[in-house]
């Protein structure tokens, strides 16, 4: 029937079987709204559960992932170092780890991209967080030795050299992609990842490709590509298209980061 005002109510917490666990404290709440028109929705916000339950407290650590540099790092903290932090937090009986955003922030390929809150995607992670030891070894001994020297140089710095770390980590990833990319992209795991994330992965890869092609992140300067069009994006990212070698590399980076 029709709801009449004033309406009295209370909040309660239920378990998975919808059985009441805890009613909130104090007197009933009172809701007194003016009459609504058909189809009108009224939202009452700012409400909170009133209780005398003790507040949950714990110890934890707050740190940007890029600061978690270890001997296995490549000049900047990465996901491999984050796993080491998880082990340390557990050993020290902490319960929470809070990190700064890890989203991709690449717009200029310079150190101005290092600000972690300037994300270009809410889904894509920054390629610099790829753990190269976890990614795999390069088969070419000369290239492996070259990157080992660069790793030692960057790890020996007192502070993170953002541009150099990102540059050489991406170069390593490209070498590894040339070596193993075709095999990785043909796996069922990768195909499943792509199917589940295509809605954001394809536009993200297209954006990165066009940003680098036009040498600017200002999409208004991308000529015929300045207006977003799904069909154009799908054509650009087509397996048969000339851009696909770079597009597939961008897919590969996100696959590695998310799995």
Residue ranges and their predicted role:
Residues 2-58, 113-131, 136, 149:
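The feature marks proteins involved in alpha-glucan
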